[in-house]
A protein has these predicted regions:
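Membrane-embedded alpha-helical bundles of multi-pass transporters/translocases
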Residues: 2-462
């Protein structure tokens, strides 16, 4: 049972700000990895893009076990005086931050190729498959324990997106300004600076996790679920639970689009356009616009038209923007920045409401099965997100290798044109796949969500 303070303190701004800091903490390591790990290991450590992408993909498949296992551990855990989910933030904030820092060690650039590949493999699995999983799954599951009110959960989703956007702002704007240097007239990544940046962000992540722990309160008692883990049954539930399958497909393709945009930004701006400053500006503008446009209006639009409906339309618009940019092939970097920011606004609408959609899926599962499995469902969803990250890394690395990218050919004209093409085509494919997944698979329309909320309210008050 949660303690009395947690049960009686009303939901308010303290919880929303605290939950925001949780995703701020997550993304100090997640966005750093998705945006700069490939660039760091290809340009600083001298590892092939294809090898880096393959390692990232293999590591994510390890998550098939660690994510589900962590979800079961969370579901089986008994509430303490600090709640059921909050204690994990305090326990695991140090390990996840240290592992992230160890990935970006430029001092090892002179080691053998095999050693560098092994170092990346081990540290990346420690960070993503073990430590990040052990803090992110309890954090995501915690939303349903903070409040039972769908409106409160929608606000938590919005504030989570604000935290993610602020992290994108700090990392996306600050890192290119500090990490890139000019050598022989070319913009290149400084390995030693990246190591320092990774260390600073790791410290910031720990501080933000602790702020989340101290500010948030759990109010909904979530009893321990001691049912044994059945992988076959769980996989069957994915394919028989249309809502879960739909959101998993959408999440996978959303990450493919978003992380390809972020990852390729580290190549298209310095290599194709020769402007790391434009990369900082693009990150700044897209983050600010998400805060000004998406955060205030996403919840209102979702309440009026429905979460599924808003997300589908926004991804269709993003697809059109990426296709137009590919056809026009703007030579002016600021025109490209305009397309980049506009697509990110569309992505931002979906990102702002997607966490509320997860709680809708959890509610739908409880309505149909009579069992609430927050941790397990969130674990399956988290695994889908990591698959999206893996596929984007594998695809990006494979395509960069296909166009002949290496530290030696990074500025060849045919290679830089290939970089531009990848930066438009890959996100466009991801966005259209998200829209199709939501439209044809995901069944939780505005009306269906309202019916589920009413059914659960009646059931819980019996």
């Amino acid at each position: 049972m949660a303690n009395e303070m947690q049960k009686t303190t009303p939901f308010g701004m303290r919880d929303k700000v605290g939950y925001m800091f949780g995703d701020f903490a997550n993304d100090f390591t997640f966005i750093l990895s998705s945006s700069f790990l490939m660039k760091f290991y290809t340009d600083v450590m001298g590892v092939s893009a294809g090898v880096v992408g393959m390692i990232m993909m293999i590591a994510r498949f390890v998550d098939a076990f660690t994510d589900v296992t962590m979800g079961q551990i969370v579901d089986r855990s008994k509430p303490t005086k600090d709640g059921k989910f909050r204690p994990w933030l305090k326990r695991m904030c140090g390990p996840v931050a240290i592992a992230s820092f160890l990935i970006f060690q430029s001092g090892l650039a002179g080691m053998s190729y095999g050693f560098k590949v092994a170092w990346l493999f081990v540290t990346y699995i420690l960070w993503g498959s073990i430590f990040y999983t052990s803090v992110n799954i309890p954090y995501g599951s915690m939303a349903s324990a903070i409040s039972a009110d769908p409106k409160d959960r929608a606000e938590l989703s919005t504030w989570r997106t604000i935290g993610s956007t602020l992290a994108s702002l700090v990392i996306g704007v600050g890192t290119p300004m500090v990490a890139y240097v000019t050598v022989n007239g070319q913009t290149v990544l400084s390995g030693s600076r990246m190591t320092i940046i990774a260390g600073v962000f790791s410290v910031c992540a720990i501080l933000c996790y602790l702020l989340c722990f101290n500010l948030v309160r759990e109010r909904v008692d979530v009893p321990a679920n001691n049912s044994k883990m059945d992988i076959g049954k769980m996989l069957k539930s994915v394919f028989t639970n249309r809502a879960l399958l739909g959101i998993i497909a959408a999440a996978l393709f959303l990450l493919l689009a978003m992380l390809t945009m972020q990852g390729m930004a580290g190549y298209v701006f310095p290599n194709f356009y020769g402007s790391a400053a434009a990369q900082s500006t693009a990150s700044l503008l897209s983050s600010v616009l998400i805060l000004l446009v998406c955060a205030p209006f996403a919840s209102k639009l979702a309440s009026r038209f429905g979460k599924k409906e808003l997300a589908t339309v926004s991804c269709i618009v993003a697809t059109v923007l990426e296709v137009i940019c590919f056809v026009l092939k703007p030579t002016n970097v600021w025109v490209y920045v305009g397309f980049y920011c506009a697509a990110f606004i569309c992505l931002g609408f979906f990102n702002t409401i997607i966490w509320a959609m997860i709680t809708d899926v959890i509610d739908d599962s409880e309505v149909r099965n009579g069992i609430r499995e927050d941790g397990t469902i969130y674990a399956v969803y988290s695994f889908a997100r990591k698959l999206g990250q893996a596929f984007s890394s594998g695809l990006t690395g494979g395509l960069l290798t296909m166009i002949g990218y290496s530290a030696a050919t990074a500025f060849d004209p045919e290679v830089t044109m290939g970089i531009f093409n990848i930066s438009c085509i890959a996100p466009a494919i991801g966005f259209v796949a998200v829209a199709l997944s939501l439209f044809f698979i995901y069944p939780l329309t505005k009306q269906k969500v309202e019916e589920n909320v009413a059914a659960l309210a009646q059931r819980h008050h019996k």
